[in-house]
């Protein structure tokens, strides 16, 4: 259906897609090892790539897949060694007519092999200027600027054109240099290893090199490992990275196993060490650093450690003395049965109630004290980068025992948390005292901590170095060799100078490690393994990390006596057994350990379970019978209370991230894919694929796959006998056994290799130099993490809030302040990090390499990619003028103040107080201006509260926000409200609190202060609700704050007052131009009576979930935030809550309702889909879309005349000729941010972060840039919409309707106070979720019991 817009020349709209080949067929062959050898496929892939860089080969578990395009000859392992004489287990071919939305396995494997081949040749041709980094390539420059990431994504369009998209992204990555390594640098930079992109942590070399030829080594450098040569050869053969073995420097690093297994580390604790502390040796040239968002180069090491004042030093000494004194009241053999908070009690009295932690509060610069409220906050301290790590890791290297399985440590991530300021709750273990100290730099109430400007941290535009990569004019001499010019410097090795600085014991004197208070011989986990036995280390682990008995109270740390437990002969208290998590669909519990020994009937949930093939009327979401990619398996990796068996632990392999295989939704995938062999660049693992070639309508999303993947035994079966019931190794495990466990866990078995007669190592030695002596770091060559698993930004100083199970209202308060802020908080200084396309290219390493690999390299334009481009009508909204309800165009919001418009659904009255500790006079003026503006615009009436005669009206001025003063203020508020209560409807009471800085730390702190007051008031007056509004102090004190700004602030206040669902306006429903009678079944097939919208997203670390709901007009609107943490059932509870909200919204509509389920970030995991399956019923039809405004697809506008307003910007004098004064009344005033066009693409696109799925229809809402020219084209602002299913047959019509609905909801952004006029192409509910997710992920949350 080609319907191009007549007014726009689509040939002038160019994309970042490049056509490579015209495909008639793709040939494939599958090879399996004869003897089930674990290494055969790995070796064949490496050897085949080494021999011919253009071969298309891919590895899946033990299977080797080979591909060829059109009539090219299929590659075969026999080409490497004819003596192998292997035959293909399966052969075939496929075309571009593949099934959607789930891609068949062979198609995804083909894309994976294609991308690997392109990256391999790019890296090799660039001579290490490009290095693969995750599923991208990092462009290494020779200056100190950040290095952009080059990302290439292949796609086979339905018109048989094989194309790739090329884009760049700047994460601020810098190569790690020896002379830049110091504790201050490590505490503010996250490290990653290439080519995998896995998060790592640097370890100081503790080996004694004195008297050896290694004396010159830097303290972080280690000698060349014995398998270093093998690793370098493997790097070159598999990735094209060529390092000089004579000049290569090596470092000891701790890889984050959770990240390796496909789950991003906790963003709010991103600088904390992982629980698994095993090390590997890696080339320094392949380690990169990403700066924290709040990095301050002027911060000294003493400031980072919080020891720059004499008072803080004395406080630490005093705490230590108090610890010694309190130890006299602890004796082994005693027990207690109470844990809780002991406030206001002498902690040294043996007669009072005791806690599991003695809480001591030293003096604080800000005089902040601990609060007894359920929700509190504390900015964390920034301790040394890895506190106590020199005591934890004292061995030279731990390569033999490096395991792929997740850590069995039962301790939480708090083991190495950074903490700061006076509210810190140390919940590490009962052996640790709470030492709350205020550290300079985090005084959120007073002094301002300097931070690097956002513009310096992230760059949205493509740097010159990336432009040169594509051969543009301004070429750098250092990179000239990339673009065909001669350059003698072809290696690019690092010759960094050795640093003289050292990290001493004094720097890490205050360790947050549990073992710091334990005997010296137990302080090192690896001591026993270092001496040939793991007994000592595992005993230490059993004691410190595994789940403890007796209410988690250590015997030697219980008090001498307790009034709460006085019977010395009674048995010790026993924990209440935890309920096993039950499936949403199956009433029977299922233990995966015994899966192979049970009936299929019970394995699938019994006779009452849902059948995977069950069909429903409205939406047929057929689901695989095998285990889904769920948060349960992923959360088990970081669970602190329950240790799962090793098989369950391995379920944490990536399920829903881009380009990771672990979807496990085809039969027995969890048994056939070793986690160590599951590489990121499997292109998102299509392996939840639908039936090949199946086209049973457009609602066959997530069909039961008929996989082509052979069923192989789980690699875990070979080591079942060596795994304990708790997932730990027995004490008798030797280092050789540990090595065997390790290699099996990654599917690498030297033992099997040597015992296999078909692969005699003696016979083939010399042919395959990679088959023996696998380095322990080999698994990190097999995985490539997607960029979606690396946060765009992170902070090394994160605020902390504490909530309990019954009251987490502070989270909703924070979300409300973030969303409805009219952008006066400036996104809390957290920048966007967009993907950027390449405007132009000429002869360079990319073009030359692609030209050498494929038959063409032609840029695609709109004539090929776009089916329809059309302007969208601006919707109308309802408002009141005097006493009449009128309709206006939605883009006239900024003229509301001049037209004396009123809210459509009535006024909202409130009374308020401004609570401040500075700028008293400015606040008084602010109160006057705010109240006058609110009343003048007829939003309602507002009353200034005066609690005492000494106070100014509407103002409470405190020198500081001590908890005692806040409680006194709460008592005054209670007294005032009790005295002045009326018999009528209560007027809402709001507190306005200014913030000195617009950052997440101060926002969290001020919200927690309000929570103290709110809890106290509600305790006395349960029916009283308090409301909060955070306003920047710059807004209050600035003389440039305009009346328009006050108007916007008043409207945002109106929108959050009760009833919160009532906003200033809503979309006015248009009278249809024609009536459609439902006289036939076909006419009513795709006609819905109402649409409701649900937008949601989960954070990349799976810690948070956000949702917003709306009807088509915005009359009904809700939003909610959930902190999931590491809980196994919180995700299901959140989904249930969302389900209830959606059903309640649908229940207010009549007739046939379509629920448009919108998932952000271009991804849809299986565990989420299983929950949403319930949302489809007889009267509710589910349309699933994935959306994102930051995609890897870009369009550049070269048209200078469309839209017509471009000419006004190109020539300011042209307005005199273009505008006719005599027809001035015929012109309309337009807001260009609201000038939106709809786009429906000719071919569907794959999801940006789930390349295993492809839309059945793709479209977008776009905005044109007013300053674009033919020579300087600008990219379109684009909100991409991918439709994944269609409840009826006309997907084109449904997508058009969804785009229209989204465009209407986007018009409410500025009216709801979500934005100040920007992002007019993003629907309000999507933008609300995006704002919450962008900011709240940087907040630590502790759940109080």
Swiss-Prot record:
Compositionally biased region (Polar residues): 406-415, 486-501
GO CC annotations, alphabetized: CKM complex; mediator complex
GO biological process: negative regulation of transcription by RNA polymerase II; positive regulation of transcription by RNA polymerase II
Presence of the UniProt keyword Nucleus in the record: yes
Region (Disordered): 363-387, 402-537
One term of GO molecular function: transcription coactivator activity
Biased composition (Low complexity): 364-375
Keywords: Activator, Nucleus, Repressor, Transcription, Transcription regulation
Presence of keyword Transcription regulation: yes
A Pfam family: Med13_C
Taxonomy, superkingdom: Eukaryota
Acidic residues bias locations: 469-482
Protein's cellular compartments: Nucleus
Subunit text: Component of the SRB8-11 complex, which itself associates with the Mediator complex.
Homology family: Belongs to the Mediator complex subunit 13 family.
Purpose of the protein: Component of the SRB8-11 complex. The SRB8-11 complex is a regulatory module of the Mediator complex which is itself involved in regulation of basal and activated RNA polymerase II-dependent transcription. The SRB8-11 complex may be involved in the transcriptional repression of a subset of genes regulated by Mediator. It may inhibit the association of the Mediator complex with RNA polymerase II to form the holoenzyme complex.
Protein name as it appears in the record: Mediator of RNA polymerase II transcription subunit 13
């Amino acid at each position: 259906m080609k319907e191009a817009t007549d007014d726009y020349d689509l040939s002038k709209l160019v994309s970042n897609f490049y056509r490579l080949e015209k495909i008639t067929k793709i040939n494939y062959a599958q090879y399996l090892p004869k003897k089930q050898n674990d290494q055969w496929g790995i070796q064949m892939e490496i050897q085949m790539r080494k021999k011919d860089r253009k071969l298309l080969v891919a590895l899946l578990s033990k299977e080797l897949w080979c591909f060829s395009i059109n009539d090219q000859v299929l590659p075969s392992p026999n080409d490497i060694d004819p003596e192998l004489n292997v035959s293909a287990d399966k052969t075939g071919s496929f075309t571009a007519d593949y099934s959607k939305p789930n891609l068949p396995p062979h198609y995804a494997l083909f894309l994976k092999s294609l991308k690997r081949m392109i990256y391999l040749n790019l890296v090799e041709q660039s001579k290490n200027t490009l290095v693969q980094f995750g599923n991208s390539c990092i462009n290494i420059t020779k200056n100190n600027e950040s290095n952009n990431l080059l990302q290439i994504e292949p796609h086979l369009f339905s018109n048989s054109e094989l194309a790739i998209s090329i884009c760049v992204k700047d994460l601020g990555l810098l190569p790690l240099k020896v002379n830049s390594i110091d504790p201050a640098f490590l505490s503010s930079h996250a490290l990653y290893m290439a080519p995998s992109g896995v998060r790592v942590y640097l370890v100081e070399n503790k080996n004694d090199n004195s008297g050896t030829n290694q004396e010159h080594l830097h303290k972080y450098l280690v000698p060349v490992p014995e398998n270093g040569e093998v690793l370098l050869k493997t790097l070159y053969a598999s990735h094209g990275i060529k390092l000089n073995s004579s000049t290569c420097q090596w470092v000891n690093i701790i890889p984050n196993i959770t990240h390796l297994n496909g789950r991003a580390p906790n963003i709010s604790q991103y600088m904390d060490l992982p629980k698994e502390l095993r090390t590997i040796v890696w080339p320094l040239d392949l380690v990169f650093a990403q700066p924290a968002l709040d990095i301050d180069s002027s911060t000294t090491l003493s400031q980072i450690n919080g020891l720059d004042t004499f008072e803080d030093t004395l406080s630490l000494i005093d705490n230590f003395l108090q610890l010694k004194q309190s130890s006299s009241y602890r004796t082994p053999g005693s027990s207690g049965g109470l844990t809780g908070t002991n406030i206001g009690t002498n902690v040294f009295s043996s007669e009072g109630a005791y806690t599991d932690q003695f809480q001591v509060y030293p003096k604080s610069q800000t005089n902040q004290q601990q609060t007894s409220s359920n929700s509190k906050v504390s900015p964390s301290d920034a301790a040394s980068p890895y506190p106590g790590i020199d005591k934890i890791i004292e061995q030279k290297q731990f390569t033999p025992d490096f395991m792929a399985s997740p850590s069995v440590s039962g301790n939480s991530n708090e083991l190495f948390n950074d903490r700061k300021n006076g509210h810190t709750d140390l919940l590490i273990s009962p052996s640790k005292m709470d030492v709350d100290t205020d550290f300079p730099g985090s005084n959120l109430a007073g002094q301002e901590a300097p931070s690097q400007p956002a513009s310096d941290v992230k760059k949205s535009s493509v740097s010159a170095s990336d432009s040169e990569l594509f051969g543009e004019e301004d070429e750098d001499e250092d990179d000239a060799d990339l673009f065909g010019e001669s350059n003698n410097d072809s290696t690019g090795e690092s010759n960094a100078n050795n640093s003289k600085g050292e990290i001493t014991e004094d720097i890490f004197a205050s360790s947050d490690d549990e073992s710091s208070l334990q005997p010296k011989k137990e302080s090192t986990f690896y001591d026993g393994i270092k001496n040939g036995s793991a007994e000592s280390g595992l005993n230490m682990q059993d004691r410190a990390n595994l789940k403890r008995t007796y209410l988690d109270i250590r015997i030697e740390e219980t008090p001498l006596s307790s009034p709460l437990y006085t019977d010395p002969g009674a048995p010790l208290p026993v924990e209440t057994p935890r309920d096993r998590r039950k499936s949403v669909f199956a009433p029977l519990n299922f233990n995966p350990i015994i899966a192979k020994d049970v009936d299929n009937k019970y394995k699938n949930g019994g006779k009452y379970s849902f059948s995977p093939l069950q069909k429903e009327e409205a939406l047929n979401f057929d689901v695989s019978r095998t285990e889904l990619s769920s948060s349960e398996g992923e959360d088990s990796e970081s669970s602190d209370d329950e240790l799962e068996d090793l098989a369950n632990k391995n379920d944490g392999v990536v399920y829903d991230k881009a380009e990771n295989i672990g979807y496990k939704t085809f039969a027995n995938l969890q048994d056939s894919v070793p986690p160590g062999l599951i590489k990121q660049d499997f292109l998102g693992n299509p392996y939840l694929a639908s039936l090949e070639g199946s086209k049973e309508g457009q609602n066959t999303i997530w069909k039961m796959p008929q996989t082509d993947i052979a069923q192989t035994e789980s690699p875990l079966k070979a080591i079942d006998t060596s795994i304990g019931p708790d997932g730990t190794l027995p004490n008798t495990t030797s280092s050789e056994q540990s090595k065997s466990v390790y290699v099996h866990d990654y599917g690498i078995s030297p033992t099997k290799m040597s015992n296999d007669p078909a692969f005699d190592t003696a016979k083939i030695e010399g042919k395959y130099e990679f088959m023996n002596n696998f380095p322990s770091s080999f698994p990190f060559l097999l995985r490539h993490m997607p960029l979606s698993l690396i946060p765009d930004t992170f902070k090394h100083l994160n605020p902390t809030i504490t909530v309990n199970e019954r009251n987490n209202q502070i989270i909703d308060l924070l979300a409300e302040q973030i969303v409805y802020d009219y952008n006066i908080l400036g996104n809390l200084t957290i920048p966007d990090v967009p993907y950027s396309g390449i405007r132009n290219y000429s002869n360079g390493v990319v073009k030359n390499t692609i030209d050498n690999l494929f038959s063409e390299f032609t840029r695609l334009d709109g004539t090929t990619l776009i089916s329809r481009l059309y302007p969208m009508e601006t919707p109308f909204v309802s408002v009141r003028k005097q006493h009449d309800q009128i309709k206006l165009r939605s883009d006239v919001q900024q003229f509301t103040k001049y037209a004396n418009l009123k809210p459509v659904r009535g006024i909202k009255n409130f009374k308020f107080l401004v609570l401040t500790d500075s700028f008293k006079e400015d606040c008084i003026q602010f109160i006057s201006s705010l109240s006058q503006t609110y009343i003048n615009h007829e939003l309602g009436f507002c009353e200034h509260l005066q609690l005492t005669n000494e106070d100014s009206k509407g103002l409470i001025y405190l020198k500081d926000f001590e908890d005692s003063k806040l409680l006194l203020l709460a008592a005054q508020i209670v007294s005032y409200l009790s005295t002045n209560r009326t018999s009528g409807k209560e007027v809402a009471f709001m507190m306005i609190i200014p913030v000195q800085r617009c950052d997440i730390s101060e926002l969290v702190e001020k919200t927690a202060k309000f929570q103290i007051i709110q809890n106290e008031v509600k305790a006395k007056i349960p029916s009283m609700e308090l409301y909060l509004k955070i306003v920047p102090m710059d807004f209050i004190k600035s003389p440039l704050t305009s009346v328009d700004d006050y108007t916007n602030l008043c409207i945002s206040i109106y929108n959050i007052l009760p009833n919160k669902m009532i906003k200033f306006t809503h979309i006015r429903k248009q009278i249809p131009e024609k009536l459609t009678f439902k006289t036939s079944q076909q006419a009513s097939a795709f006609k819905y009576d109402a649409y409701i919208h649900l937008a949601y997203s989960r954070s990349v670390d799976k810690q948070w979930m956000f949702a917003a709901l709306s009807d088509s007009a915005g009359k009904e609107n809700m939003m909610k935030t959930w902190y999931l943490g590491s809980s196994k059932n919180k995700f299901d509870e959140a989904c249930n809550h969302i389900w209830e909200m959606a059903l309640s919204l649908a229940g207010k509509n009549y007739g046939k309702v379509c629920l448009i389920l919108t998932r952000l970030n271009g991804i849809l995991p299986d565990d989420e889909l299983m929950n949403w399956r319930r949302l489809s019923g007889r009267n509710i039809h589910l349309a699933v879309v994935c959306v994102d405004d930051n995609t890897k697809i870009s369009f550049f506008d070269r048209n200078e005349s469309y839209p017509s307003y471009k000419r006004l910007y190109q020539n300011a004098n042209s307005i005199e000729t273009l505008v006719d004064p005599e027809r001035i009344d015929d012109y309309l005033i337009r807001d260009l941010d609201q000038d939106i066009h709809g786009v429906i693409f000719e071919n569907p696109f794959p999801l940006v972060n789930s390349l295993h799925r492809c839309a059945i229809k793709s479209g977008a809402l776009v905005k044109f840039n007013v300053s674009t020219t033919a020579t300087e084209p600008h990219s379109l602002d684009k909100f991409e919409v991918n439709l994944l299913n269609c409840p009826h047959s006309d997907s084109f019509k449904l997508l058009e309707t969804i785009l229209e609905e989204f465009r209407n909801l986007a018009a409410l952004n500025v009216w709801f106070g979500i934005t100040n006029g920007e992002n007019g192409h993003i629907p309000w509910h999507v933008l609300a979720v995006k704002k919450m997710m962008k900011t709240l992920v940087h907040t630590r949350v502790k759940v109080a019991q």
